[in-house]
Amino acid sequence: MVSKIDGKLFAEMIIQGAQNLSNHADLVDSLNVYPVPDGDTGTNMNLTMTSGREAVENNLSQQIGELGKTFSKGLLMGARGNSGVILSQLFRGFSKSLETYETINAKQFAESFKAGVDTAYKAIMKPVEGTILTVARDAADAAIQKAEETDDCIELMAYILEEAEVSLENTPNLLPVLKEVGVVDSGGKGLAIVYAGFLKALKGETISAQSPKLNKESLVNEEHDFHGVINTEDIVYGYCTEMMVRFGKNKKTFDEQNFREDMSQFGDSLLVINDEEIVKVHVHTEKPGDVFNYGQQYGELIKLKVENMREQHREVVKKEHDGGKAISTEETQAVDTAVIAISMGEGISEIFKSMGATHMISGGQTMNPSTEDIVKIIEQSQCKRAIILPNNKNILMASEQAAEIVEADTIVIPTKSIPQGIAALFNYDETDSLESNKSRMVESLEAVRSGSVTYAVRDTKIDGVEIKKDAFMGLIEDKIVTSHADQFETVKGLMAEMINEDSEIITMIVGMDADKTVTSDIEDWMEATYPDVELEQHDGQQPVYQYLFSVE
């Protein structure tokens, strides 16, 4: 029997929950409704939970309230994708309810689940039932009921998990698309897996790590992945330096403004995150040792990292020369108004830059940037105002979360595709106010229809369309409208659905995996079939999607 949970035990619950999710992330991914080749739910929840776990491991506390704060902050900054953001909000409310406690009993434990659900529902503008939210709510309601009958946290957690799994099995009855495909909700499954890890920890059991099956290389989104390539000799401060300092009682009193001013003398691209007991610093400098020595004035150095950016850049140049994929390492420029576009593909990034985007973040369907990735760019730009273009529905919530965290006055234009992002940026006026720009840019989205061509990763039937693994699919927004083994036939089927008598311009963005012969055939066919519609073509070099289309 476990009657009390303290910080040490809660930390173990987090670790086991994260490990269990990591072991089963590919299973959660396999439950995604649409058979597009993305990382999506399991990947994003895993990376989010891992961020929370790492935060806890770096700042262990016996007090559950203090540990909860750390866990919540780690999840908040590491949240990726909508599923990751919802997970972070669930545990944000969960942890908030614990903040005054050193230990909690079963009743308080149950109440924390309810607080998490309340926070998550408030954070989501349009909650959808049959998702992770429903599973969390049903489990929390069960927790409140069970806490009236038992003081044993093990018995309580077992019941919470049981009811979460019952709720999960019911999700297809609440969300028709799940029933059509024959799966349960992937986010709800991920949450149940975390809860199973919690139960293991409460029982004193541990979960062994399994060999990772995820393609981590396609998911890494470090800060040096964000930007365009520069010359090695142009790098003024060559060492990307990070440290975490735990404040000491007999050390120098921390004043964030003074700390920032002092740190800025060591270099640029300064990022300071102060979490009461710990300060995390990122700076580009020529003297990492001086940065660390300065940090020691305030307390104990608990995490250090130094990367030689000049050496990284030499490797990038060599890879480019050898025909490999370049990693971008451009310094983040300082601006008054940062216009930040999340982009996949070098060609698409160039389009955004040419239209006025000041900063790019590498990301898209297979690589959703975290809240912290977006926050870093805004902070490093030293801007007073920021505009974020997510350009993907699964990056929208992380963008909104980042906008709430940063000091700069920040708006998010709810672009859910690359064509929408381009249309919005076309209507951006750098001389106008944020409010006026937002109104104009959001309005422009209504005139754009977005389409895409990609391949299926499994057999399924959805939206009335039979789909075979490795066949091509044509999508309008998120809806699959056609599928064919032949790429050209898929494009023809997609255009038949997208183009009408009012269509004037078709923009085609060609991906890195597009067949040149097929692209040429598409051009000829479009000219012959739709002579009154102008075709604009761009080399986007995007992965996953052979073609992106917009019709206006």
Swiss-Prot record:
It comes from the Bacteria. One of its GO terms (molecular function) is glycerone kinase activity. InterPro entries: DegV_domain_contain (IPR050270), DhaL_dom (IPR004007), DhaL_dom_sf (IPR036117), FakA-like_C (IPR033470), FakA-like_M (IPR048394), YloV-like (IPR019986). Residues 8-200 form the DhaL domain. Pfam families: Dak2, FakA-like_C, FakA-like_M. GO terms for biological process: glycerol metabolic process. This is Uncharacterized protein SSP1546. It comes from Staphylococcus saprophyticus subsp. saprophyticus (strain ATCC 15305 / DSM 20229 / NCIMB 8711 / NCTC 7292 / S-41). The lineage of its organism: Bacteria, Bacillati, Bacillota, Bacilli, Bacillales.
